[in-house]
């Protein structure tokens, strides 16, 4: 039995009507995962025993007709801590780490009676764009298993795209929800910075990180964001803004909406076939009654350089806690305290993590702070001002998520600069703290291409409204990959 073609609403309706029990759905989910995931490697750890116990309790108590997540299988990226369930951040450093508390978003999932079926693979400590830097295994794209799923939330994207779960959580520091969502043909939302609590998210870049949902449809995504959003006393950066019902505006009507298309997002560095998909999306929005006009974000070209200074500097600080003393990996046969630090970190961290720690430490060091970190902060302000200027006249900004579709496994792993440039279109959104979403827009040589929608701060509702209208008009989301799903 497969439930790939069912969205949250229909799955919930079947559970309420007792066409299927929560236990039957959970067992079918694990059976499907055991069949599909060995080909893809989306998961690092499964949570079968606990999920089946939760499902049995739900069957006994009855499914709440007003709670669309009750009994629904969900996956969680492995940098979000889960009490009693191994959380590794895909690093040897945390290979055997079992948290003693839940992240706030995990508590919200459990309070909604969702079933956490497993933890998904990712780039180590969320540093990467292909899920190839995981210390444990690579994850493969279900549309073409010779290609990457994107990253760093590649496991979550693949779990959803291949029909193993209808909803997964990811995190996005520079594009890590949107880029894999684009590469896998699913919907991924990076909410406004502060919309969702970061308590329990293993920190990479604390001024950039944000947790968000990954789903097959816009409506499911809106419902998932409603569940996890809101202020949290544990996270002082979480906003006290009221969380609206993100599903309320999903009418399909976007007449009169004004959308900006940055000329910098459609330039020479964009694959012509990706550009063609986005141009078709522009026409679709115009057919739906929206106005799309060219705008400019002139300082976005400096985004990648500024981001890798800021994010690496914050990572350098955040990862100091992994020292071989308090918890995590500790090297054997050490001779003294310095040896513990040096060898544990040298052996426990992978190459990409060490590269970013060194870059960040250099940027923060005496004599270089003003030239690099301070200057990057100034560029960040310029990028924020660019967005603010455009949003004086426009409701949304649209463009590609990534310059290309999914690339071949191994093609860019040895070339960090090329890998970093995959995030050139997503990074400015994180630097500005704005919400960004990927919606399936079409295909280039049989590989999914995502449309990026960028909204004003705390205006995810307008993004969902536009994304839903586009999704329903194009029906691209109904196409399924070669591995998993209906295949």
From Swiss-Prot:
Protein name: Glutamyl-tRNA(Gln) amidotransferase subunit A
Catalytic reactions of this protein: L-glutamyl-tRNA(Gln) + L-glutamine + ATP + H2O = L-glutaminyl-tRNA(Gln) + L-glutamate + ADP + phosphate + H(+)
EC number, as in UniProt: 6.3.5.7
Active-site residue numbers: 77 (charge relay system), 152 (charge relay system), 176 (acyl-ester intermediate)
Pfam families membership: Amidase
Gene Ontology MF terms: ATP binding; glutaminyl-tRNA synthase (glutamine-hydrolyzing) activity
Any Gene Ontology biological process: translation
Alphabetized UniProt keyword annotations: ATP-binding, Ligase, Nucleotide-binding, Protein biosynthesis
Oligomer status and interactors: Heterotrimer of A, B and C subunits.
Originating species: Lactiplantibacillus plantarum (strain ATCC BAA-793 / NCIMB 8826 / WCFS1) (Lactobacillus plantarum)
Entries under PANTHER family matching the protein: GLUTAMYL-TRNA(GLN) AMIDOTRANSFERASE SUBUNIT A, TRANSAMIDASE
């Amino acid at each position: 039995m497969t439930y790939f073609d069912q969205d949250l609403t229909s799955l919930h309706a079947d559970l309420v009507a007792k066409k299927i029990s929560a236990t039957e759905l959970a067992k079918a989910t694990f059976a499907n995962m055991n069949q599909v995931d060995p080909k893809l490697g989306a998961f690092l750890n499964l949570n079968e025993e606990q999920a089946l116990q939760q499902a049995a309790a739900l069957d006994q108590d009855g499914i709440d007709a007003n709670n669309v997540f009750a009994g629904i299988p969900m996956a969680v990226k492995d940098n979000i801590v889960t009490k009693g369930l191994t959380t590794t951040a895909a690093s040897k450093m945390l290979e055997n780490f079992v948290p003693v508390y839940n992240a706030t978003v995990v508590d919200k999932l459990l309070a909604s009676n969702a079933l956490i079926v497993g933890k998904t693979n990712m780039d180590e400590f969320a540093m990467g764009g292909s899920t190839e830097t995981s210390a444990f295994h690579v994850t493969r794209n279900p549309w073409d298993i010779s290609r990457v799923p994107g990253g760093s939330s590649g496991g979550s994207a693949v779990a959803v795209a291949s029909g193993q779960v209808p909803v997964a959580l990811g995190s996005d520091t520079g594009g890590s929800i949107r880029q894999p969502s684009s590469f896998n043909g699913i919907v991924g939302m990076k909410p406004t910075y502060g919309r969702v609590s970061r308590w329990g998210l293993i920190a990479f870049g604390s001024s950039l990180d944000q947790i968000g949902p990954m789903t097959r449809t816009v409506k499911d995504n809106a419902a998932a964001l409603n569940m996890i959003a809101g202020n949290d006393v544990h996270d002082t950066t979480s906003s006290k803004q009221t969380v609206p019902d993100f599903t309320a505006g999903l009418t399909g009507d976007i007449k009169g909406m004004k959308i900006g298309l940055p000329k910098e997002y459609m330039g020479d560095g964009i694959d012509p076939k990706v550009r063609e998909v986005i141009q078709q999306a522009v026409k679709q929005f115009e057919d739906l009654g929206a106005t799309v006009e060219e705008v400019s974000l002139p300082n976005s070209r400096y985004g990648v350089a500024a981001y890798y200074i800021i994010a690496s500097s914050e990572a350098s600080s955040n990862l100091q806690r992994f020292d071989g003393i308090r918890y995590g990996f500790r090297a054997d046969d050490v001779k003294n305290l310095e040896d513990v630090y040096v060898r544990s970190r040298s052996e426990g961290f992978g190459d990409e993590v060490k590269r970013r720690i060194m870059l960040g430490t250099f940027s923060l060091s005496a004599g270089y702070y003003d030239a690099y970190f301070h200057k990057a902060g100034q560029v960040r302000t310029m990028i924020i001002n660019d967005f603010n200027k455009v949003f004086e006249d426009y409701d949304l900004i649209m463009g590609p998520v990534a310059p290309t579709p999914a690339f071949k496994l191994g093609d860019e792993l040895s070339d960090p600069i090329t890998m970093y440039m995959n995030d050139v279109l997503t990074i400015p959104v994180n630097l500005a703290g704005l919400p960004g979403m990927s919606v399936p827009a079409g295909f280039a040589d049989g590989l999914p291409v995502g449309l990026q929608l960028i909204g004003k701060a705390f205006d995810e509702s307008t993004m969902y409204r536009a994304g839903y209208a586009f999704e329903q008009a194009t029906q691209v989301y109904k196409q399924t990959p070669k591995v998993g799903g209906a295949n």
